[in-house]
Amino acid sequence: MSEKSRTLADLPIGQSGYVRIVNGDGCRRRRIIDMGITPGTEIKIIKAAPMGDPIEIAMRGYSLSLRREDAQRIELLTDGEAKELREKAVLSARNLELKAKGSLTHSADEDAPYHRRAAMITEIMLKGRCKPGSCSGCREEGVCPICEKNGTQEGHDGKEKVRLALVGNPNSGKTTLFNAMTGSREYVGNWPGVTVEKKEGKVKDTGLYTYGHDMTLVDLPGIYSLSPYSMEEIVARKYITVEKPDAIINIVDATNLERNLYLTVQLMELERPMIIALNMMDEVEKRGDEIDVHKLSLELGVPVVPISARSGQGVEKLINGIQGVINAAHAEFHEGFNIEPDDIYNGYTHALHHQIGDLVGKYAEQAGLPLHWAEMKLMEGDGETIKELALPEDVQQRVDKIVKEYSDSAPLGDSESMIADARYKYVTRVCAASLRRGHPIDQLTTSDKIDRVLTNKYLALPIFIGIMLLIFALTFGTVGAWLSELVSIFMDDVLTPYVRAALENAGAMEWLTSLICDGIITGVGGVLTFLPQIAILFFFLSILDDSGYMSRIAFIMDKPMRRFGLSGKSFIPLLMGFGCTVPAAMGTRTMENEKDKRMTILLLPFMSCSAKLPVYGLMAGAFFAKGRALVILSLYLIGIIVGILSGYLFRKTIFKDNDAAFMIELPTYRLPAAKNVFTHVWERVSHFIEKAGTIIFAMSVVLWFLQSFDLSFNMVQSAETSILGRLGSFIAPVFSPMGYGCWQAAVALLTGIIAKEAVVSSLAMFCGFSLSAGGGAVQSALSGIFTPRSAYAFLVFVLLYTPCMAAVATIRRELGSRKWTAFAVCYQILIAYVMSFIVYTVCGLFMV
């Protein structure tokens, strides 16, 4: 292969190359370009995953992983060719600019009052000169751009309702800032897709910073660009363009400035009032770097506030600065806080932009879209914008012809590449003017050194397996088992006797005493016994997530998962499925490919969620006390294996010819914030408690009633003759081939569809045992309906069959189809039945 035709996939590890062009078409190519891989970009190969694919590359100050097949799309130049190409591009651009109508250039420092105004707002905020009752900014600058008062700030009469949109890249600290500004507690993670729905919260009114405004902050999904290729981008873009918030808060990771400002430039094109929250400035200082915030604000024409969302530093100044943005919008909205496109685009882009603008101006106005935004999106061939503009056929044909002519003659590729390249060139100039690095860009950081170990070719998989084994041992072994035992003793030896005695002394009727003690406390208390294990599991998962290790897991696992029809991106929601299927299913929205998303959702229920832990703990403790941890671990492994094999089956049948691009940013390793970790744990634990206090409580009452009364509503002496017993007896024969063809097991599985924890409370009531009595007593109570062999087969069925109703509802919403949801439920029941039968049969060779 000649040097000119070599691709990024041919580049050896440790070497750099320059991009000639990104081949291909469609969303896959667009995603590669949006991530910063444009003609002339320098890219360095850092390493390959332990199995050789994907690879990690470094460019524009950040790291990205992509598959070798995608790297083969990227043709490279030598350094000399790249320089020559740039010179030709500049010359050609100047020639084209002469043909364009009028001059389209001006400086950010000349004839741009909103640039100077933005910089002035930034300076006032940084120095804290604008405060209620004492605005020295007013006296020094004339009319203060923050409070618009001469002298004392008196605030507004009444509360003006303001809606703010919080927008930023994944891993930029967006959700942490949302929590800091609103006091809301929300899951904070370090992988794409944590915030998958629009969330709202009231900005905290300190009395000093909101100036009479009633501010609502909308936390939009984390996105890398405004291209409509993922559900995240569609939701964020639609909210900004259709619902038009009063102002945008663009959170930018200061440690990854160039990458984050690409989205900033796109947001400026939307012509909405905006302020930049420059996050993680404390980390910038630790690195020895320096960002001139005033210069950055002047270059962009947008107010900039340095903050640290984790510590809360600068957050009040940010809220204060929002007032300036809103007032500026009222005062001079036409100019707004946008940079004119001629500040960013030149040459080819300017000429193309100018011609398209003359054609589509009135249609953009009718559609309620900013003209510059519409022009840029038409140049990119954006399908959503084309639909929104609804151009007449002749106008659309003229636009297509203009774009094609420029694309065919452009030295940097097509119009898509030109637009992305122009944005990144502008961002590079802004960074050069405002960022001073205290160390060489290629110098190894602490994060790089950690990554060399955790993603090492030989150490990555053993370390990952070791971490997971340690988590399981602590959760289900020593610490988790001991804490669960303490809760169990309290429920059965302290609470139940006390309540029973109190009711009897009060002369309560026998049925009421039975309802409270044998129904509610036994049912709800039995589930709460496993609360410590769930808390420990989420504690460790949160640490892995918040530290940045989750993205490395996807990087490591992409190739082995592809062999079974899955993607490395699938691994993240599948791993979160071990916690709860509901947020895991929602997390698939970050997957651009619809088939990948559907297949991942179909496989999620096979990942054993935390709600099944009480069932595992009960049965494993009773029948496999000495090997309890190994039995539970084997169930998790069975779920993983079934998921992998199902994925392979789906890829060969209903999801044929589906191969989405795998591109994921590898964020800097960070020490997990204790507040974030414990907030996450509390949210999951409180959700579990809420479930126990509502669903499990109601189920316990209903089950007690159905167990205690017959069809004539007379109390029964034996649960077998009760309403529930008769229902269970009717369906029990279905489970006879697996060894648990009794009414108690059948009914427990039915209640498990409502909530998996209900299986424990059902068995406890039906079999009449107390969890605090110890494994021997529980085994004695269960031995009438289970043997070790059938108990293990029962656990396999619980592992694989239909998830709880909340999960089914979420799956229905995410799949957007009743047909696919019905298929998922039926497939899971079928697989559970077949696997349970196989396990029961195979175990017959070793146990009774």
Where are these regions (language model features)?
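Juxtamembrane inter-helical linkers in multi-pass membrane proteins
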Residues: 489-497, 551-581, 656-680, 724-726, ...
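Transmembrane helix-loop junctions at the membrane interface of multipass transporters and ion channels
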Residues: 606, 610-633, 806-817, 838-848
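Conserved C-terminal guanine-recognition region of P-loop GTPase G domains, centered on the G4
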Residues: 204, 208-209, 235-304, 615
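Short, membrane-interfacial amphipathic segments enriched in basic
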Residues: 432-447, 502-513, 664-679, 716-724
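Conserved G1/Walker A P-loop phosphate-binding module
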Residues: 124-225
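Extended, low-charge hydrophobic alpha-helical regions
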Residues: 406-407, 414, 418, 478-520, ...
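Core alpha-helical transmembrane segments of integral membrane proteins
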Residues: 454-555
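Alpha-helical transmembrane helix bundles of large polytopic membrane transport and channel proteins
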Residues: 275, 285-438
